[in-house]
């Protein structure tokens, strides 16, 4: 497969939570650090970088400031260094319960404290020097085995997860990381959890919880017995092996999970590449040849469609659409026009893609009618995590409303309904819009919401009122935005 941004390893960003459940924060004023924040936002986000030398020391860089954490000999800490010096070198010492201890490499003292009383002067580790790692990236991704160069996916027939996919195609390749009790669970697309013996279980039991470790920018998952997940045997079954130290077999990359979609034309048949290079609406079944990976260009907001056969849709002579391009170009870009529950696609020749009488697609129309409208269905988010500008969407304690500014997230279930989606929460209740634009999550009857894919990795959600869902100043989810922009766009 060509690169073209299809396989992008996620830069691991995280927060560090102390023993009093407060996040390590880098302040712009005076470049001071504290542990006062109750949730994970921009100021609480950090990146681990390897030290330029050959040792085991690491650097902690604030994503917010772009500066490095440092500890002086007298224990004073700051986040002021634009270039990493000797005082910026730390050793990460993972503890049996999964938490980290940070020790200054040049001075040998431990970093910790509470509120604005942080220092790196402790000679022994107490609870104040223990830090929990909380990933700051969107938790839905693909998992790539570093040693086998194969993607992890659910194998329903064998009832296991295996690292044997040469590409992350279809819903089975989606994994959701669930953060609970200072550890992480791996949740499959059918909402089961991976246990360390390779079994899939419905509850996040202790043997299905893992400690995250970082090594050279890669991830390792350590189980409660101190062993690491790895692909095992010819099938690459994912389970805890015998190793108590992470080697290449135990390392994984997290990759961005782009939306994969199917399109249905006016003849009620699926758009497909099953019968060759022509893109045609001529299939009754929804399989790999009918599934397309959709990417949106951040600058132009136009999209590309990549097929399972290894080619992008591209405009050819006489307006034809073939799935043969190996590189992104102007001819592979399509402008999306959202028309209620349907979408129209405009090609680089300025004409709309339509379905011809023989089912083939061609960009030959000047206007949009039924033959130019398609139903677009997202297939690789049966479970959904939403993040806005202020945080994740999560149920509001003691209420039927939804918060939009949380550092923890709820996992919602999606079902498709003729160009729209129904969203179901943790207790089985459906989302619906109430009075004055409020969005509630305890409905007995489902309301249809339209998803509009507006930017790379972000969508807008339109309620039946025609208004878009946004994160309000109160921190509650509301359906009162007029335009799909800003706080009305959601990372998914």
Swiss-Prot record:
Tell me the Gene3D superfamilies matching this sequence.
2.80.10.50
Q: Does the keyword Nucleus apply?
A: no
In terms of superkingdom, the source organism counts as: Eukaryota
Q: Where in the cell is it found?
A: Cytoplasm, Cytoskeleton; Cell projection, Stereocilium
Q: In which tissues is it expressed?
A: Localized specifically in the outer and inner segments of the photoreceptor cells in the retina.
In the record, what terms sit under GO molecular function? actin binding; actin filament binding; protein-macromolecule adaptor activity
Q: What Pfam families does UniProt report for this protein, alphabetically?
A: Fascin (PF06268)
Q: What is its main location?
A: cytoplasm
Q: Which InterPro entries has this protein been placed in?
A: Actin-crosslinking, Fascin, Fascin-like_dom, Fascin_metazoans
One GO term of the cellular component aspect?
A: actin cytoskeleton
What are the protein's UniProt keywords? Actin-binding, Cell projection, Cytoplasm, Cytoskeleton, Retinitis pigmentosa
**What processes in GO biological process is this protein linked to?**
actin cytoskeleton organization; actin filament bundle assembly; anatomical structure morphogenesis; cell migration; establishment or maintenance of cell polarity; eye photoreceptor cell development; visual perception
Q: Does the keyword Signal apply?
A: no
In its UniProt record, what illness is this protein linked to?
A: Retinitis pigmentosa 30: A retinal dystrophy belonging to the group of pigmentary retinopathies. Retinitis pigmentosa is characterized by retinal pigment deposits visible on fundus examination and primary loss of rod photoreceptor cells followed by secondary loss of cone photoreceptors. Patients typically have night vision blindness and loss of midperipheral visual field. As their condition progresses, they lose their far peripheral visual field and eventually central vision as well.
The UniProt function text for this chain reads:
Acts as an actin bundling protein. May play a pivotal role in photoreceptor cell-specific events, such as disk morphogenesis.
Q: Which PANTHER family match?
A: FASCIN, FASCIN-2
User: Which family, according to UniProt?
Assistant: Belongs to the fascin family.
Protein name (record): Fascin-2
The record lists the organism as Homo sapiens
Gene it is expressed from:
FSCN2
